[in-house]
Amino acid sequence: MLENKIVVLTGGGDGIGWECAKAYVKAGATICILDKNQLAENKLEELKTTKTLALTCNLANEAEVANAFNTIIEKYGRIDAIHNNAAIAHPSKTLDQTSNSEWDLLMDINLKSILYTTRYGIAHLKKSQGCILNTSSMVGSIGQDNHAVYVATKGAINALTKAMALDYAPFKIRVNAVSPAAINTPTLQAWSQEQPNKGEIEKYLNKLQPLGDMPAGDVIADACTFLLSNAARFITGTILPVSGGAELGYRTLI
């Protein structure tokens, strides 16, 4: 589905991002992973392809993002898709408990990184008539307690996706977002293990989706592969829920 496409993927080193990296390679793409952590060689070897470029990049630093895009263009000559996946969710706090530095960090990683990847990638997407995909979250539509700033960034991503879709449609550039619910990733597992009521949390998360237990990240990766592919060539401005129906309404979970 993604044969011969050059895909830039932020936050591709673990969790949903890593599942997307594997799916994109399987679909035929060359992937350029931008991640704050250096990817170990043995992890890249799991992809079983030479069609990868891994760059250590602080996505909140404009100069580093600019340098990363210059490196990608020097190596491949074009960009066909950008998947803005990098995000942080913690700390778990109400708004009044949030410090200025915590606010700035979440805004920088979750939102300003999209500004930077667009600023340095859009000229190349205009040439390729490519696409942009943003990773949002169900909480950006329905809210969540004790995650005020994270929720705000995901709600902003939903609105930004629609605005970008309108702005770049004249250039035949599609812009969409994928909106997961709870996904069984190492990050979520680590967080739940730290909670005093971890057993109750795990039971709740596994009941959250009407379609069944909390899925692994590959279900999100499959949806992302579709949205980046030509099969979605007439889809833009869409916030695609991949949530097993978790956002449909209140359910009795006990």
Specify the residue positions occupied by each region the protein language model found.
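Substrate-binding pocket helix/loop in short-chain dehydrogenase/reductase
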Residues: 93-95, 99-105, 205
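Residue(s) in the substrate-gating loop at a strand-loop-helix junction
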Residues: 137
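Conserved glycine-rich cofactor-binding loop
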Residues: 13-15
